[in-house]
Amino acid sequence: MKKIRIAARGSKLSRIQVRMVEEKLNKLGIETSFVEVKTKADLFQASPLSQLGKGVFEKEVNQAVINGEADIAVHSMKDMLSETPPGLELYAVLKRDPPFDVLISLSYRGLFELESGKVIGTSSMRRKNSIVFYRKDLLVRDLRGNIDTRLRKLFQGEYDAIIVAEASITRLATYDHQYQGINYSKFDPTLLTPEANQGIIAIVGKSNSPLKDLFRKLNDEKTYHEAIAERTALNIIGGGCHSPLGVLFEELDEGEYRGIMTFIDGKKKITVEGIFRGKPEKVGGELGKRLLKEIKDEGIVIET
């Protein structure tokens, strides 16, 4: 078999995620090559993500596959649009890494230990709104850049604390010893519900490619079910990766899920949770509809 060409962004974390896919393919005796792609998010790092539109981490990477420059695209699934572009489909997801958000600080052990007036960095609307909801006395400053850049800004004293995905830290630490031993405080999902599909690496390719069956071998079924349930719930409300919504499903047993979904806008927080049974699309739809009803009852309109 020819080498599999893998398209992805060129950031340190993205290269690590490609490496995780490559290792699985190499175990099957398949060689790979890397195709680096610059995305809109890479080119406009000074701009807030909310101003760049949707799909800023994935469009150009997917286009490389559509153009025949690569065989597959590897993404952090939380950055993907809710609908896969025409001609492409989700081939597989790797086993989920921790889905939670974490706070990293050199001086403080958690959000509620930060002194009034301290500066906390994040580029996520969901995280910003959560900080304002719980700690209006903190200064929230936009934080763009790859995860290693964000950590460097923290260590250089530009921020007193930052909030990032736990998965990004664990992946960095696994493949680069300089990131081992970073202490962080993990958020319980009832306090800060993660973004949909956080901690999941997705593999996307052409719908008509014969490679599709090969990548099915890499698919983690439990993670796939959780991913579909979360995306379904998000689609019910119409939110994207820049919306103030968090959702997390855990498949407890085949067809049984624990789910939680939260809307938070800095002034109001609405959370629904429970145990659900059925296929991923069904349980995701149920949770999404429950939250949507409560949002509408409060007279809140979410921008899509």
Outline where the language-model segments fall.
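Small-molecule-sensing regulatory modules
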Residues: K2-K38, L43-A46, S50-L52, F133, ...
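Short, well-ordered beta-strand segments
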Residues: R5-A7, A73, Y91, G121, ...
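Short, structured active-site "lid" loops
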Residues: S47-I72
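Paired acidic/hydrophobic, glycine-rich loop segments that form the ligand-binding mouth/hinge
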Residues: G55, E69-S76, D160-A165
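Ordered, amphipathic secondary-structure segments that act as subunit-interaction surfaces
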Residues: G68, I72-T84, Q198, N208-L211
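A conserved helix-loop-strand patch within extracytoplasmic ligand-binding domains
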Residues: M77-K78, P86-L138
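Glycine/Thr-rich phosphate-binding loops of Rossmann-like dinucleotide-binding domains
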Residues: E83, S130, L172
